[in-house]
């Protein structure tokens, strides 16, 4: 319904990270729902959205900074802004609704992410998205499966321990301290993204989408013949 009517919004945000390097800018376009109370929206065509979720979470944060600052400016001018801080992530079988964030908190989260981004050239940062997603929203066994992989008959679905970036990170970790064993599940709950999402994990709504079951051609023909015989 209202998800069909969408438009793009340009954001241009400035942040003072107090790092001695001046202001940091975040500029980009976000897809939002139409109507009188637009909110951020994104579509994922995969059932497994773990690898997309945290990227969407980052967009959600900057969208809330955008909305919060516009709302503050609008109130000062006597014209409150109506953009919604809620965000919707659509997959092929679920609707994920992320709650609006208070402006002060959204700005703090945004600053944390920008500091992390600015420091990546000097200090690598390991983040296992699928394993962390499983820790937040799924069972412990699924955390292990996301990291170690799964054997299904003769097929193997690789886990994040086989990821080339993780392997490289572990390989060079010995240069700055104790080497990391790439086959051991690392501590996941001390990352920025885990801590941020954990604060709101109980407020994130997940609704199942009803997927119509396709009717085979032979079944349609049988039903048509039955209908003709009843007439």
Describe these PLM feature segments.
Residues 1-231:
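Structural signature of nuclease core domains in nucleic-acid processing machines
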């Amino acid at each position: 319904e209202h998800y069909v009517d969408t438009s793009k919004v340009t954001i241009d945000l400035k942040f003072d990270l107090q790092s001695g390097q001046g202001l940091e800018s975040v500029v980009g376009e976000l897809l939002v729902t139409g109507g009188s109370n637009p909110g951020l929206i994104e579509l994922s065509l995969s059932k497994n959205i773990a690898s997309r979720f945290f990227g969407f979470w980052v967009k959600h944060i900057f969208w809330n900074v955008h909305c919060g600052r516009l709302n503050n400016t609008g109130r000062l001018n006597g014209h409150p802004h109506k953009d919604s801080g809620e965000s919707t992530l659509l997959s092929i079988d679920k609707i994920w609704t992320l709650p609006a964030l208070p402006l002060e908190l959204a700005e703090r989260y945004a600053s944390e992410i920008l500091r992390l981004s600015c420091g990546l050239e000097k200090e690598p940062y390991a983040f296992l998205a699928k394993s962390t997603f499983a820790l937040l929203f799924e069972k412990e066994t699924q955390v292990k499966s996301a990291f170690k992989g799964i054997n299904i008959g003769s097929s193997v679905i690789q886990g994040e321990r086989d990821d080339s970036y993780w392997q490289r990170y572990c390989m060079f970790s010995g240069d700055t301290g104790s080497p990391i064993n790439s086959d051991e599940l690392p501590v996941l709950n001390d990352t920025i993204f885990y801590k941020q999402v954990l604060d709101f994990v109980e407020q994130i709504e997940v609704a199942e989408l009803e997927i119509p079951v396709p009717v085979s051609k032979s079944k349609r023909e049988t039903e048509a013949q039955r209908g003709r015989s009843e007439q």
